[in-house]
Amino acid sequence: MLQPKKTKFRRQQKGRMKGFAQRGNQLSFGSFGIKSLQSKWITGRQIEAARIAVTRYMQRQGQVWVRIFPDKPITKKGEGVRMGKGKGAPEGFVAPITPGRIIFEVEGVPYEIAKEALRLAAQKLPVTTKFVVRHDYDIQNQNA
């Protein structure tokens, strides 16, 4: 499961996710990717399930980049515990995602395979996504 090795503080405030992604909103490594269209928290398990779906469909060809990392600690109080008496114990980590954020990137496979692999990955995620292609990628001459 994805999580930081060490954090400065064990607990963090929930915060608000407003606006669009200011960073990580363009393809940097691969020719294809999926971009978020919603704000949501994505857990390490969801990221890993999507990554496995991509690599299995691509049959270990090409390369996959995961552009997000769950570094925000989430806390939860025990069952049946009343309100107050402090914040709960850390339960896990999430990656806060805003619209426009690139989640996965793929390189080294044809357009159709990349599109289907990323569609399968998108089904594992709690956000609606959009398939994006690098602006200088030529779909007609991909095998040339």
From Swiss-Prot:
Record-annotated disulphide pairs: none
GO cellular component: cytosolic large ribosomal subunit
One Gene Ontology term of the molecular function aspect: structural constituent of ribosome
PROSITE patterns: RIBOSOMAL_L16_2
UniProt keywords, alphabetically: Ribonucleoprotein, Ribosomal protein, RNA-binding, rRNA-binding, tRNA-binding
Pfam families found in the cross-reference section: Ribosomal_L16 (PF00252)
Domain of life per record: Bacteria
Gene3D superfamilies: Ribosomal protein L10e/L16
SUPFAM superfamilies reported in the protein's UniProt record: Ribosomal protein L16p/L10e
GO BP terms in the entry: translation
InterPro entries: Ribosomal_uL16, Ribosomal_uL16_bact-type, Ribosomal_uL16_CS, Ribosomal_uL16_dom, Ribosomal_uL16_sf
Self-association state and partner proteins as the record states: Part of the 50S ribosomal subunit.
Family, similarity comment: Belongs to the universal ribosomal protein uL16 family.
Main function: Binds 23S rRNA and is also seen to make contacts with the A and possibly P site tRNAs.
Classification via NCBIfam families: rplP_bact
Protein name as it appears in the record: Large ribosomal subunit protein uL16
Biological classification of the source: Bacteria, Pseudomonadati, Bacteroidota, Bacteroidia, Bacteroidales
The encoding gene: rplP
